[in-house]
């Protein structure tokens, strides 16, 4: 009888422990995403962790002129290969020196255009931001969300610059404004168009300026 009571008490405590664990698991709240993370996630940011290499060609057409350069980036090792018709340069972003700084500046610029939604997460400690709703987008004139980020005045290749992102309730960017040194007037306004999904990454491959013979776009985008 004594052994039976001991077994019964042990079983009761075991069941209570299981019930308590289940309650803890159920009651654990999910982390609420901030606006930066919501925009990044809307563009497939959750799949970035699976990317081992990214190759793309950055193109600019202005009037009759054309400019392009190609990059191959291995984000886990941070090795970058820069390719043009004239030259090929390989360097590592963990060890940028005076010789590779200019090349790295070009890479940072081109990568920012390609992966700006992800930069909201990667760079969030380096800028301040403000989010508002029902703001008129500069190109379409539609009412959208507006997210303004202003980079710190120190560090990076373009300190103090500001960007205004415009998007709908799906958090997918439709337009943006670049304001150099956080000046009030826009330095550049472009659309975000021709989204393509590559290995779960949703990337805008075309940016056009209204009423201007200018387009910035990406070709040969490969994600592995």
Predicted ranges, named:
Residues 143-224:
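Gly/Pro-enriched, hydrophobic low-complexity segments
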Residues 19-21:
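Bacterial signal peptide processing site
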Residues 2-8:
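Sec-dependent signal peptide recognition
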Residues 91-161, 183:
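Flexible, processing/modification-adjacent segments and terminal tails
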Residues 14-17:
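C-terminal motif of bacterial Sec signal peptides marking the signal peptidase cleavage site
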Residues 27, 32-101, 126-127, 131-136:
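N-terminal mature ectodomain segment of secretory-pathway/periplasmic proteins
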């Amino acid at each position: 009888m004594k052994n039976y009571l001991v077994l019964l008490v042990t079983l009761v405590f075991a069941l209570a422990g299981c019930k308590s664990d289940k309650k803890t698991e159920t009651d654990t709240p999910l982390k609420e995403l901030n606006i930066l993370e919501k925009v990044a996630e809307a563009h497939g940011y959750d799949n970035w962790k699976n990317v081992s290499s990214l190759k793309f060609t950055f193109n600019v057409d202005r009037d009759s002129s054309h400019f392009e350069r190609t990059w191959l980036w291995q984000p886990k090792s941070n090795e970058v290969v820069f390719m043009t018709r004239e030259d090929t340069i390989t360097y590592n972003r963990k060890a940028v020196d005076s010789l590779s700084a200019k090349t790295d500046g070009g890479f940072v610029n081109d990568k920012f255009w390609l992966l700006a939604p992800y930069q909201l997460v990667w760079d969030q400690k380096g800028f301040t931001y403000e989010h508002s709703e029902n703001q008129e987008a500069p190109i379409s004139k539609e009412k959208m969300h507006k997210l303004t980020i202003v980079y710190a005045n120190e560090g990076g290749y373009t300190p103090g610059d500001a960007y205004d992102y415009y998007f709908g309730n799906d958090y997918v960017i439709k337009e943006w404004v670049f304001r150099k040194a956080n000046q009030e007037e826009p330095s550049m306004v472009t659309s975000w168009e021709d989204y393509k999904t590559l290995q779960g990454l949703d990337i805008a491959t075309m940016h056009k300026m209204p009423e201007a013979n200018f387009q910035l776009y990406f070709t040969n985008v490969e994600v592995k």
